[in-house]
């Protein structure tokens, strides 16, 4: 969802990622929070962006 050209993010913060996959451009499973079921957020993950429960 966008409001006046800006993406609206869901509350909370993304979990911290400690290790990343070796792929140069891993595929993303989401592009914004609104690609994820509520209340999840679209966050950088181990290998590309994924939906996670916010912290």
Swiss-Prot record:
SUPFAM superfamilies: Elafin-like. GO terms for molecular function: peptidase inhibitor activity. GO terms for cellular component: extracellular region. Residues 7-55 form the WAP domain. Keywords: Calcium, Glycoprotein. The keyword Hydrolase does not apply. The keyword Calcium applies. Glycosylated. Inhibits calcium transport into spermatozoa. It comes from the Eukaryota. Gene3D superfamilies: Elafin-like. This is Caltrin-like protein 2.
